[in-house]
């Protein structure tokens, strides 16, 4: 009897240790998994087989959409039986579950609602949160809660909840009729500001409701369509109620600004935005496209096994704690039925799942290396402003023949600069201006690029002046600061940045789809606009301010690279004029369609390189440390390292520990 009691206590201890996961930590080993789609009609045995498949293919996590519609009974109670099958199966196969709240909605609503219709629906959601959290919080399989599926929406719905919230918000944020200098305000971004704030406040409310009943598990959310929606996200504010940040990155839905060859670049930019947004929180890619499109997706595709591998390593190269694919098994009906999956209709693993397994195995075999690697900074950051996207949403012309006048130009420009630097092997950051640390006392050797950010509020003048005065280099490109926060052309009504930039614009001239601009001995392809700086003939103005300098190139050369596809001139120019780390590992020259991230893991250096070109590339590296302990972590056929040279096959990935 005593032996049984001791055994029972031991089992209880193991159960408790397993069930109390706590929030995701930055030093956790990365997780790999896939969404398991639960719906009526599935048997316990079928559900169990999917968790077995995950386990057998190197996966240790999954995400489940907790459909209230499949639980809610006529009397207002909830029957959790169907989802209990999944949690029991996850426990058996040692799979961690991220459970996504998906409150009752129309059966054709593929993504779920982002805001309640009214307070009554919000109250119902609160009761569902209570029921779901109290039912599953002690499950050993539960790892975390996803607040709601993919916050972010094209336009706010006209509902009582939104109308009432907007009325309250306007009391605290009244519109201006006139600026302080007497000019009228004819357009404003009040609705865009409100949408950002209501997103934050509603997500905070959900997190607070969860914490009433569960204070231990991870609280997470996944933004989506980042290149279109980033203006709706205030990541620094989200950090106050989340314990990890995530995102959805579906090439078919979200990468419409890019062609197929550029999807790896888009994934890198997406991951960098989330990494910066997470700050000190851990992050992982909550949804990563795993399978085929038949009738869903805006740009239908099926990822190749090579792309699956590339995307996983890209996110890991941006310090992610892993990725969860959308999805393992197919939904049976409606939009996306029979699509997106990592297994076939017979339940067998596809080549894509096997490819993911190989990456998972490589990480697991080198777990210590991937616990908490840190990107080795180049000293260069590309920053963007939400206000520029807000302005573009009001000014751009969707069907215009010129990309620079269409939606997307204000994010394509920063991404073009990111690509130009990445193709030199440099770790450039991509972050919101509010995520940059302006509290340092010395910015010598640091550079900020502001590329075609058409609206910059006056409140950022002091931070940017501080950065430059303390030794930083600021490169300003394109139509940056054309508008202020009130959509006033400040170059006409009093230029806020005249002291910092060292002048004002005489005029912007629309010249051609593509033309050349000469800058510091470089000939740069330029799209649409040439900016004349008042009082000078050169295309570039260089102004010393305090201990630093401002390089002002008011022509849209980043869009020129994006539109022409020729990034070498922009890359050569940026590297020649911007201070950056001279000791960091980098390429000896520009290599088109070559991506690299270098990280530090303790005393070890980790190099992740991806060749998206169509030919074999032999890449020479600068500043490679001398070591006899090189170890290949992962390599496609035709990829290797010899001396200071990387041999990279087309579509190949090479991961090396130095």
Features from the language model and the residues they span:
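N-terminal carbohydrate-binding accessory modules
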Residues: 19-61, 73, 88, 92, ...
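Hydrophobic targeting/anchoring helices
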Residues: 220-222, 228-415, 506-509, 528-530, ...
């Amino acid at each position: 009897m005593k032996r049984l009691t001791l055994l029972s206590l031991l089992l209880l201890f193991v159960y408790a240790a397993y069930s109390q996961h706590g929030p995701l930590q930055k030093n956790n080993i990365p997780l790999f998994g896939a969404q398991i789609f639960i719906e009526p009609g599935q048997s316990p045995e079928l559900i169990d087989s999917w968790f077995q498949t995950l386990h057998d293919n190197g996966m240790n996590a999954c995400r489940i959409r907790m459909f209230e519609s499949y639980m809610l009974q006529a009397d207002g109670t909830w029957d959790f039986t169907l989802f209990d099958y999944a949690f029991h199966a996850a426990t058996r196969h040692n799979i961690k579950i991220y459970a996504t709240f998906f409150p009752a909605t129309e059966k054709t609503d593929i993504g779920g609602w982002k805001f309640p219709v009214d307070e009554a629906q919000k109250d119902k959601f609160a009761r569902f949160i209570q029921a779901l959290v109290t039912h599953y919080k002690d499950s050993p399989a539960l790892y975390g809660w996803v607040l709601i599926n993919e916050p972010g929406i094209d336009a706010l719905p006209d509902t009582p909840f939104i109308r009432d919230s907007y009325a309250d918000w306007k009391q605290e944020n009244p519109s201006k009729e006139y600026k302080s200098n007497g000019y009228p305000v004819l357009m404003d971004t009040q609705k865009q500001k409100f949408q950002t704030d209501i997103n934050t406040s509603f997500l905070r409310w959900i997190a607070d409701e969860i914490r009433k009943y569960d204070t231990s598990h991870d609280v997470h959310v996944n933004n989506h369509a980042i290149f279109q929606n980033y203006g709706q996200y205030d990541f620094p504010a989200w950090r106050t109620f989340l314990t990890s940040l995530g995102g959805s990155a579906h090439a078919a839905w979200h990468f419409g600004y890019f062609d197929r060859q550029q999807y790896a670049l888009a994934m890198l930019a997406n991951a960098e935005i989330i990494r910066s947004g997470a700050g000190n929180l851990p992050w992982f890619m909550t949804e990563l496209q795993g399978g085929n499109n038949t009738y869903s997706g805006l740009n239908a595709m099926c990822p190749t096994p090579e792309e699956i591998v590339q995307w996983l390593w890209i996110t890991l190269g941006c310090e992610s704690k892993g990725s969860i694919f959308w999805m393992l098994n197919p939904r049976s009906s409606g939009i996306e039925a029979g699509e997106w999956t990592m297994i076939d209709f017979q339940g067998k693993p596809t080549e894509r799942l096997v490819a993911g397994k190989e990456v998972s195995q490589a990480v697991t075999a080198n777990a210590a290396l991937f616990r908490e690697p840190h990107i080795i900074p180049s000293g260069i950051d590309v920053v963007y402003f939400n206000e520029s996207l807000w302005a573009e949403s009001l000014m751009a012309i969707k069907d215009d023949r010129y990309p620079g006048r269409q939606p997307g130009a204000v994010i394509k420009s920063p991404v073009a600069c990111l690509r130009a630097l990445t193709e030199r092997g440099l770790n450039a950051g991509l972050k919101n201006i509010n995520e940059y640390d302006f509290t340092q006392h010395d910015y010598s050797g640091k550079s900020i690029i502001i590329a075609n950010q058409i609206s910059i509020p006056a409140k950022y003048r002091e931070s940017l002046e501080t950065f430059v005065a303390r030794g930083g280099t600021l490169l300003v490109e394109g139509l940056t600061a054309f508008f202020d926060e009130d959509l006033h052309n400040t170059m006409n009504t009093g230029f806020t940045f005249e002291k910092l930039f060292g002048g004002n614009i005489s005029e912007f001239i629309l010249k051609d789809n593509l033309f050349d601009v000469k800058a510091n001995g470089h000939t740069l392809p330029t799209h649409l606009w040439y900016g004349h700086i008042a009082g000078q003939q050169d295309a570039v103005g260089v102004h010393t301010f305090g201990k630093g300098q401002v390089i002002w190139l008011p022509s849209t050369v980043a869009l020129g690279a994006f539109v022409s596809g020729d990034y070498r001139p922009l890359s050569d120019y940026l590297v020649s004029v911007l201070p950056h780390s001279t000791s960091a590992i980098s390429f000896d020259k520009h290599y088109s369609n070559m991506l690299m991230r270098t990280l530090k893991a303790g005393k070890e250096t980790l190099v992740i390189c991806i060749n998206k070109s169509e030919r074999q590339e032999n890449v020479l590296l600068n500043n490679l440390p001398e070591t006899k302990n090189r170890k290949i972590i992962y390599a496609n056929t035709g990829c290797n390292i010899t001396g200071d040279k990387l041999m990279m096959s087309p579509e190949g990935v090479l991961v090396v520990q130095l």
